Amino acid sequence: LRLNNDGQPDPLSGKPYSSRFVTECITQGARRFGWSRRSHAPGSMTAPNGAQVGWGMALGNYPSPMSPAIATLRIGANGRTRITVSGHEMGQGIKTTIANTLLQGLDVDPNGLEVVIGDTSAAPQHQTGASCGTAGCVPATLKAVRRMQAALQELMDGRSVPGNIHRQLATIRRPYLQVEVSEVAPGQGAEAIEYLRVSGDGAAGPEYPEFTSMSWIAHFVEVRVEPTTRRIRMPRCVSVVDCGRVISPRTARSQVHGGVVWAFSAALREATEIDPRYGGYLNCDLAEYLIAVNADIGEIEVGFVYKPDPLANSAGLKSLGEVVMAGASAAIANAIFHATGKRLRSMPFRIEDLL
């Protein structure tokens, strides 16, 4: 059904997507999961221990905005490299991603590399949110790398000096080389940088002048419903993402793992209880606010389409953090229906809903 109804233009703006590899997400996820072995009838799959087995899938998408950013890169003859970027750590391992981007383009000592983020005295900082951390930091970092390559080539003026950049600078008795760059989203001008300096904002997207930029994900999940307690567990999940170029596969995979756990917990555990008399929260600690635990979730397999999006930004990447949450809860609901024949439409899905 999904493969036969894959719409390409953005239904809201009518503009084409910058990239949309939903078909690849679905086919790769189905192959990894073994979707072809699925029995279609609800309640038709049973585990050896008597648990009802359900397989479900769903798609998710999320806007891919971009924040303007400033990056300053300094390489010294003393073996030190320092890059300051507009951006900060939101849990995705952004320092690792920035370092990977820099080290892929410049021959510098990684042991002497310092990545400075979240410091307004070094660079203006944008908002925390909207999955635009990497999409802001990395294009600016990549631009700084290319500017440094050009500056180094001009400085060397055709001379061939052995060794890495630190050794080359030391050989020609240059204490350091520094560049500063700024990067804006498609369709933005220099005023976006000034707005960033003043307000700490200035993000654009997902609708740009010529296109709309979105990230996409396909989730395939298996749930097992215990026959007596009706407790729901998820022994495995396969999630395949179209997020453009993947700069740091290890940290990107970790983001998807965390997002799937977040989605499972939201779908089956988490809910705030409000006092109807006074409006206060009744479950404001982890003793009362239920969350997922290790026993609830088994293997989480993550895949990427690995196709850069050259329209979205100079780095070819799109947002990743929050797209993982989109669609995962729906896939779990579909799997519960496949296991039990009950269509649950209000989260969290709890044991009492299956009694």
For each feature predicted by the language model, list its residue ranges.
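C-terminal catalytic domains of large/alpha subunits in multi-subunit enzymes
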Residues: 1-51, 55, 101-355
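Short acidic alpha-helix initiation/capping motifs at coil-to-helix transition points
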Residues: 92-95, 328
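Residue-level recognition of well-ordered beta-strand positions that form the cores
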Residues: 60, 74, 84-86, 224, ...
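A short, ordered amphipathic alpha-helix with a cationic face
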Residues: 88-90, 322-323
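Thiamine diphosphate
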Residues: 94-102
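Conserved beta-alpha junction segments in alpha/beta enzyme cores
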Residues: 54-80, 85, 92, 206
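A generic structural motif
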Residues: 87-89, 243-244
